[in-house]
Amino acid sequence: MMELKMHNVKGTENLKFDAEVGKVLNIVIHSLYTNKDIFLRELVSNASDACDKLRYESQLNPNLLDSSGELKITISSNKDENELYVTDNGIGMSRQDLIGNLGTIASSGTQKFLDAIKNSKDSSQAVELIGKFGVGFYSSFMVASEVIVESRKAGEEESWVWRSTGDGEYSISKLDNQIPCGTKITLVMRPEENEFLDKFRIENIVTTYSDHINFPVEFIDEEGKSEKLNSKAAIWTKLKNDVTQEEHNDFFRGVAHVGGEPWMILHNKNEGAIEYTNLLYVPSIKPFDLFHPDRRCSVKLYVNKVFITEDNVQIIPQYLRFLKGVVDSPDLPLNISRETLQNNRVVEQIRKSLTKRVISELGKKAKENLEEYTKFWTNFGAVLKEGLCEAMPTEEREALLSICRFHSTGDKKLVSIDDYISRMKPEQGYIYYLTGNSLDSVKNSPQLEGFISKGLEVLLFVDPVDDFWTSVIHEYKGQKFKSVTRADVDLEKFSPEEKDKENKSDEERAEGNTDSILQYFTKVLGNAVKSVKISKKLTDSPVCLAVDEGAMDLRMERFLREQNQLNYRTPKVLEVNTKHSVIKSIIKSYAENGENPTLEDMVHLLFYQACIVEGEEMDDASLFAKKLNNLLGKVII
């Protein structure tokens, strides 16, 4: 390989960087980049831009390509000299280009070129180029003590060399002998950065950041043998119908790091006010770390096929973190280091557009094939419902809620809330639901007895996240949600007329006794309960716990206590089923014999029973066991 020291130069001109570049370089070198790998990404990206420019210019002037051959980028190293070389046969730079592009940190050759294209009448020839802030090149000084740039612009005869140690000055010289058109960058590496001279280190950086750029990136070893480093095609740039299922499967396995095929593919190109392409996959398998607190979204961000990051990406909301794939856009705003996204209007627009599209496609899947959608929901439904807890417009929340599926007392299959509403009784007025730890526990809950007996459907929520979203979402399409654990639930209006008259007659006959027994229950239980009421929803169980309207849900309160977010337990309402044989026996015994220790034990045991069923802690488990044993002993005797 021809080294710079073999060239003769003349007319060396020493210049100072504009815009106090010495200070800016200090920021770039020591503060701006957190990952030193970035320097090679930037140099390869710049080289790709140069090739793109030449390809575009050659459409207007074919002679520019005559001596260039295949457009490509080569990387090589010389460990003896401690030097790294990045070469391209792209458009190259003239003396003025070197001053304008490398001597002024606020300037950008690519941006100037893009501006020229935008002003051109021949807009159909527009080429995809990455907009830069003019600092990517200077990241080389993180690892190099000196940077040397040799370049000849396509179509021109003169060759130039630019060099700097990053101390605020640079020099430009004219080369006596002509070099091929394009640009060669030589980095004289700092001794502690010689790891970047290793072929495997270079290959890792290229495959990580530049695997999908338009041009071949080759490594040339010391014997002159070349090896192509970037191998993958950017299939998201193809037309949707041109990508085969096999290509999707291979690409999915590469970005998702899981086996199998994707459950759903979303491949779209948005050409509106904001331009972007997305190729997103929903996996068929739930990742083991889906609910790990440190797990982040793993959608890769590209800018015109150059990988930027997959950390801190705000393009996909956290509740869609199961998505895998890429988002590529020339309009994405980047901060000055290109390592993190700026939180601004463009990012938010892409996020909203993508989120809306994903929810829409999932909705179509749910309608087309419920069995297949159930597989998705089993894997990712709990994550999707996390989005219901986020602040969002009502329309967006209802769209998300519409694709949610739940267990129900009215159907063996998962149902949507729209399905539920379509089956509501005319006088119902509420979407009834019950939360619990498992499907079996909620199905056997006493809270459901009255609803089932009257043919009222109840949605069954069994994921921990259900406790949270039901506390912030109170209605859907004008229908209010109501937990069946609320003490003010009244099911009498759903009773058949004859049965209703019969129940009222029974209540009138027992009214005097029930008032006194409620007072007795309240006296025995004291501060352990907020109040004691006659239940209007129990049919088979003697008692249950309930909470007043507006109070915290039973399960939510328990969760907060378990997480040490709540250090007290609020007294609950005890509902009593006066039609149950046990309660009738207590009423009769109290009426005939008044207060007695056995009756008091029975009241305590009924309360403990209600606590156990709802998963509530008992203040004194030993007392419960003692009272139970006393009562059992009397029964056995």
Curated annotation (Swiss-Prot):
GO cellular component, as recorded: cytoplasm
Region feature A, mapped onto this chain: 1-338
InterPro entries xrefs: HATPase_C_sf, Heat_shock_protein_90_CS, HSP90_C, Hsp90_fam, Hsp90_N, Ribosomal_Su5_D2-typ_SF
Entry-linked Pfam families: HATPase_c_3, HSP90
Keywords: ATP-binding, Chaperone, Cytoplasm, Nucleotide-binding, Stress response
Region annotation (B) ranges: 339-558
Region of interest called Disordered, as start-end residue ranges on this chain: 493-512
Localization per Swiss-Prot or TrEMBL: Cytoplasm
Region annotation (C) ranges: 559-637
GO molecular function: ATP binding; ATP hydrolysis activity; ATP-dependent protein folding chaperone; unfolded protein binding
Domain of life: Bacteria
Record's function text: Molecular chaperone. Has ATPase activity.
Family, as annotated: Belongs to the heat shock protein 90 family.
Subunit text: Homodimer.
Protein name per the record: Chaperone protein HtpG
